[in-house]
């Protein structure tokens, strides 16, 4: 990428040397006069001007891979300077040779450099695309941890960086979407409308979220945060307005993708909430369960049973089903709940909570940040070590509940098609045993049918 941006800078300098007067374009009065002279047509030109943001694509990286400082240093020392020089060079070329407007990038280079430049551009495209793909992986993982998407297989590609992940399902989806885009739009020019609308809306969302960060995390006053946000929104909304004219020319595509993703995420979130309410209907609390054990003690068998449940306030249905069918209970029962908090990381002192209800019944609540990975066997080893609750790995069985939804006419607050969509997402979700890295030979899954 250093070679790429250096090449852009050299190409720009070459053009500037042809027509040094292009540097006068840095004066904003030229832009103001242009808008005043051209009115609405001048405003719509912003939609084309906005495409200069494509130059920064190769710098893109989610903060799970690179920190704030490296990105700032790269931008101000290399990327920003190279892009400004290059766009000045293209402007100089168009002043000197207006007929070059159909392909100013390659015409800015010497003829002998055409094929090397095509090869370099291809490599830069691959690298820039890889950065975006990695960002999608990280965002998907965070959405899964926060409960907005079903569990998927997550492969860690680095032992040192927890943010470097690979998600096969997302990778295949991106591949098919990319092929469909190429076949459907046929050229990058036809994609300009889709790109402009997608990025301008993303910038507005980022600006609004920056206000929340400034208020809640940085402690800025409402006046200061609001003034900065409004200043950015003026420019963002201007670009969005110019790009709205391109909805019919490809701008519909990012809106369609956003609608599909939004529907999937909200359906999963709302469906899980309704399912949790169904599971809690008539459920026993740990205290009531222990009372029933004392009144009617079952046969106790050696070993430890770990029952995972998303709601720590009630007894998991899998435990009740196990007791009903086997007529026995392990001497030690651990009710394990894994919670993902809306922060990236949690301190060790906030991680674990262990409650002893008596009769060998314990509740372990484990909290993780959305950038952290839950490793249940490692967690239970830590519980044994720090909380003096012996959970020998070779003497522990994990019981998981697997719900099968029966779609009925019972009102749930969701449309029938969304109920069916949620049921399909449930069926195709990654197994909890694999997701939480449970040893396969020590897992028992108990199914339950639930009217939804």
Where are these regions (language model features)?
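The structured alpha-helical core of multi-pass membrane proteins
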Residues: 1-452
């Amino acid at each position: 990428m250093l070679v790429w941006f250096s090449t852009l800078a050299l190409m720009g300098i070459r053009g500037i040397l042809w027509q040094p007067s292009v540097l006068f374009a840095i004066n904003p009065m030229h832009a103001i006069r242009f808008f005043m002279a051209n009115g609405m047509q001048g405003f719509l030109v912003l939609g084309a001007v906005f495409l200069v943001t494509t130059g920064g694509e190769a710098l893109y990286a989610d903060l799970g891979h690179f920190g704030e400082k490296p990105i700032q240093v790269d931008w101000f020392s290399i990327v920003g300077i190279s892009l400004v020089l290059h766009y000045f060079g293209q402007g100089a070329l168009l002043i000197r040779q207006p007929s070059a407007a159909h392909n100013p990038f390659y015409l800015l280079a010497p003829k002998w450099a055409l094929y090397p430049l095509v090869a370099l551009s291809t490599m830069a495209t691959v690298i820039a695309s890889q950065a975006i793909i990695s960002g999608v992986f990280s965002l998907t993982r965070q959405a899964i941890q926060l409960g907005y998407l079903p569990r998927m297989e997550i492969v860690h590609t680095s032992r040192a960086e927890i943010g470097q992940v690979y998600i096969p399902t997302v990778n295949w989806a991106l591949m098919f979407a990319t092929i469909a885009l190429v076949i459907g739009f046929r050229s990058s020019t036809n994609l300009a409308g889709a790109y402009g609308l997608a990025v301008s809306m993303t910038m507005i969302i980022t600006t609004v979220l920056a206000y929340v960060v400034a208020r809640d995390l940085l402690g800025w006053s409402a006046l200061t945060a609001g003034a900065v946000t409004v200043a950015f929104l003026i420019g963002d909304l201007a670009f969005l307005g110019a790009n709205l004219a391109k909805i019919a020319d490809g701008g519909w595509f990012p809106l369609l993708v956003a609608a599909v993703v939004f529907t999937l995420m909200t359906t999963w979130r709302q469906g899980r909430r309704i399912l949790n309410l169904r599971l809690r209907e008539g459920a026993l609390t740990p205290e009531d369960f222990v009372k029933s054990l004392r009144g009617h003690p079952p046969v106790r068998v050696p070993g430890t049973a770990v029952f995972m449940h998303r709601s720590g306030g009630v007894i998991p249905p899998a435990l009740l089903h196990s007791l009903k069918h086997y007529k026995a209970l392990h001497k030690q029962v651990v009710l394990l709940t894994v919670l993902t908090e809306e922060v990236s990381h949690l301190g060790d002192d906030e991680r674990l909570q262990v409650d002893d209800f008596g009769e060998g019944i314990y509740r372990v609540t484990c909290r993780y940040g959305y950038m952290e990975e839950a490793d249940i066997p490692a967690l239970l080893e830590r519980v044994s070590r720090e909380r003096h609750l012996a959970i020998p790995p070779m003497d522990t069985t994990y019981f998981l509940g697997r719900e099968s939804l029966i779609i009925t006419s019972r009102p749930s607050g969701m449309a029938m098609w969304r109920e069916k969509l949620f049921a399909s997402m449930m069926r195709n979700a990654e197994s909890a045993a694999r997701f939480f890295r449970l040893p396969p030979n020590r897992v028992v899954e108990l199914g339950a049918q639930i009217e939804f």
